Each structure stands twice: as C-alpha cells, then as structure tokens.
C-alpha cells in the first residue's frame, strides 16, 4: 500500500488498520507492506498509525463485552500459525528492523490457551529482508519510506508477490501512472484492499 504526500491522512490510517489487521492479517491481500513517499507524509502518518495499531482491541469475538468495538481482532487460526508469526517477528528484529509495536505475549482473559497475537509494526524495513519478502499471513505490518513514486513502484515490481496493491493520492496523474506501471493482479486507488470479483480468478499474476 503506497501513500503519497497529498493523501487524506485520516482515511489512510483507518484503512491501514482494517486492511492490515482484519481477520488478524490472515488474508491474501492484507496490507502487510506500507510505503510512504516523501518524508513529510511519513512523519505525519507514522505516530498516528502506530497509535492506531496499538488501539486495536484483541479479544474473543464471541464475548458480548466487545460487541460494539469498531476494530476487533480475534486469534490466528492455529498454534502453528501463531508460532510462525512469532518466528517472523523475531527474524525481523534480527534483520535489523525496528519493532515499533510488539504484539507477542498477549493473553486474552478466558482464552489463555487461545492463539492470540496483538498487532505488530516494523519500521526501518529494507528491501530484501524476510519480513518484507515473506507472506507472514498474520497481524504484522511493515512501513518504509522512499523519495519518489517511481521508487515505490519499483519496490512493488521487485516483490515476489503481486496479488493486490493500492495507492493513496488525490492526483490523477499519479493514479494513472500507478495503475499502468505497478505489476499486480489487482490495483486499487484510495482503498485499503482492492475488491476482487469473487467469481473470477485472482491469483496475483504480475
């Protein structure tokens, strides 16, 4: 998910959270990699985004006490999935990325044996790191900053996966350029996750 300098910040923050942490990140098009273009927008978004990630409520979705929560996250699907996500978080730390939000070690009352993880966010991520290249399939997002839209498109096109990507901008030229040049099965403009037509194949072909 690419964020340009003219993006509407509140819309970006809301959709970063819902697209990254909905279904505990267990979606083939979850926004796991965020690229901001320009230092100004990066510095504006980062603190708000980190706080929004921390504010995600992790709980038993069947608990009536959390029925009115706007952003509620349940468990990952299995103990194996939880361990894989935790191992990937540890890998990111060892690779030198900064773990700005750490979702490990979370315990949900009444579900002590559940496979729950909180939200995790990495900053200072570099192309080539495993946390950038591997599909983690869990509640983990990475955010990185580049200078130009061309740089962001290059990151997309060099990535091993290409199921879906999005651009946040109010600029029609940037939107058209992104639509033409980004190599991805589905491309969205000002949406968190491009909506697939479910009865047609969407295998992430570049």
Language-model features, listed with the residues they occupy:
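Conserved glycine-rich beta-strand-loop-beta hairpin in the small C-terminal domain of fold type I
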Residues: 69-72, 114-117, 134-140, 159-163
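ALDH superfamily catalytic-core signature
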Residues: 1-126, 148-150, 155, 189
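Short acidic-hydrophobic, aromatic-tinged amphipathic segments that line or gate anion-handling sites
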Residues: 143-147
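Cytochrome P450 core scaffold surrounding the K-helix E-X-X-R motif
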Residues: 128-133
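Short, conserved phosphate/pyrophosphate- and ester-handling motifs at nucleotide-, phospho-/glycolipid
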Residues: 37, 139, 171
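Short beta-strand->loop structural element characteristic of the AMP-binding/adenylate-forming
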Residues: 1, 141-142
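Short glycine/proline- and charge-enriched loop/turn segments
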Residues: 66-70, 137, 199-206
């Amino acid at each position: 998910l690419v964020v340009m300098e003219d993006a509407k910040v509140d819309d970006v923050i809301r959709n970063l959270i819902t697209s990254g942490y909905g279904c505990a990140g267990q979606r083939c098009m979850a926004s796991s990699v965020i690229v901001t273009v320009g230092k100004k927008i990066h510095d504006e978004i980062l603190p708000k985004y980190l706080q929004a990630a921390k504010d995600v409520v992790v709980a038993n979705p069947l608990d009536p006490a959390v029925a009115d929560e706007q952003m509620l996250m349940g468990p990952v699907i299995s103990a194996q999935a939880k361990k894989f996500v935790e191992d990937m978080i540890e890998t990111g730390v060892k690779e030198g990325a900064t773990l700005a939000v750490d979702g490990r070690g979370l315990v949900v009352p009444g579900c002590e044996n559940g496979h729950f993880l909180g939200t995790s966010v990495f900053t200072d991520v570099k192309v080539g790191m495993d946390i950038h290249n591997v599909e983690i399939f869990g509640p983990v997002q990475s955010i990185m900053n580049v200078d130009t839209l061309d740089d962001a498109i290059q990151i997309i096109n060099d990535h091993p996966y290409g199921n879906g990507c999005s651009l946040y901008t109010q600029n029609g030229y940037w939107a058209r350029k992104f639509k033409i040049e980004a190599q991805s099965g589905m491309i969205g403009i000002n949406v968190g996750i491009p909506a697939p037509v479910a009865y047609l194949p969407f295998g992430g072909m570049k």
